[in-house]
Amino acid sequence: MLLQAFIFLLAGFAAKISALMTNETSDRPLVHFTPNKGWMNDPNGLWYDAKEGKWHLYFQYNPNDTVWGLPLFWVNMTTGVDNLFYIDKFQVREVK
């Protein structure tokens, strides 16, 4: 039973990644999270909220440059149980 669930989940990931690979115009990685523009630090604080059924990912973000610097923001992104497709909605808090 557990093996069947794992195979089903793996097949779902493979289908989603295959669909992403058809976008040959993008220079963004297929699996690693990246913002649409700007600089981001390494992801931190990845945790699962069982109450909401969502994964949370936190990282520092500079929307105005491709290197670290001010203004700097903490960003929280969320995803469902697949942990592959994140909601493109930044919840931002400025670092002061």
Curated annotation (Swiss-Prot):
Native species: Saccharomyces cerevisiae (Baker's yeast)
Active-site residues, record numbering mapped to chain: D42
Gene Ontology annotations for the cellular component aspect, listed alphabetically: extracellular region; fungal-type vacuole
Keyword Heme part of the UniProt annotation: no
Xref: SUPFAM superfamilies: Arabinanase/levansucrase/invertase (SSF75005)
Class of this enzyme: hydrolase
Catalytic activity: Hydrolysis of terminal non-reducing beta-D-fructofuranoside residues in beta-D-fructofuranosides
Covalent S-S links between cysteines: none
Protein name: Invertase 7
Family: Belongs to the glycosyl hydrolase 32 family.
Chain sites annotated for binding substrate: W39, M40, N41, D42, Q60
Pfam short name (any one): Glyco_hydro_32N
Signal peptide extent: 1-19
UniProt KW Coiled coil keyword: no
Record key words, sorted: Glycoprotein, Glycosidase, Hydrolase, Signal
Residues bearing attached sugar chains per UniProt: N23, N64, N76
GO MF, one annotated term: beta-fructofuranosidase activity
GO BP annotations listed: sucrose catabolic process to fructose-6-phosphate and glucose-6-phosphate
Protein EC: 3.2.1.26
